[in-house]
């Protein structure tokens, strides 16, 4: 790809945001919900694992689609929900924690290759410091967003996330997407916990 990834940064854990509140304990409770997802085979499989009817849609269309009832909900990290003011057109956050969303600090590989070994080491160290500060702030922000949205009247559902994890993994396996992963990758990811 011609890039050097310096460090992953934590963007947030993706949660479900619903237009109308409902009792949600597991994926079966979301059956029939038209949920906005970014699109693509992986996102569609993930959404089906959540129990919803996936509705691919660009993020700029989500606020209007929620306000008119075109979709019943969407999923994103809490910071994205708040930045887009989705609490104005929704009633509930369902803390499914179905995906941890990273972003990556990267540099063009031709530029990286022009740096001295010392400058490369300094860039990597600075990226690590920045990622640590970001990650700590994002985790604290997520807690404050839940508290803030609950204070504004949004209902917060805390379902059994193990039920969602099991359903999503079954969907990935049956879709054939997991088979495309390098051998042992899933097991390595599971060990990160």
Residue ranges and their predicted role:
Residues 3-193:
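N-terminal secretory/targeting leader peptides
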């Amino acid at each position: 790809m011609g890039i050097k990834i310096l460090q992953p940064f934590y963007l947030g854990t993706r949660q479900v945001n619903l237009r109308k509140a409902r009792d949600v304990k597991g994926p079966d409770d979301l059956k029939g919900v038209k949920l906005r997802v970014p699109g693509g085979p992986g996102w569609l499989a993930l959404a089906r694992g959540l129990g919803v009817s996936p509705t691919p849609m660009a993020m700029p269309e989500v606020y209007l689609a929620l306000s008119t009832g075109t979709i019943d909900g969407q999923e994103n990290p809490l910071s994205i929900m708040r930045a887009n003011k989705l609490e104005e057109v929704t009633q509930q956050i369902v803390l499914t924690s179905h995906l941890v969303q990273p972003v990556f600090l990267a540099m063009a590989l031709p530029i990286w290759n022009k740096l001295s070994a010392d400058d490369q080491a300094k860039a990597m160290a600075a990226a690590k410091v920045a990622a640590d500060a970001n990650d700590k702030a994002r985790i604290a922000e997520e807690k404050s967003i839940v508290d803030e949205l609950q204070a504004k009247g949004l209902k917060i559902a805390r379902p059994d996330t193990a039920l969602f994890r099991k359903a999503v993994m079954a969907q990935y396996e049956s879709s054939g997407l997991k088979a495309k992963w390098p051998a042992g990758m899933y097991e390595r990811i599971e060990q990160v916990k």
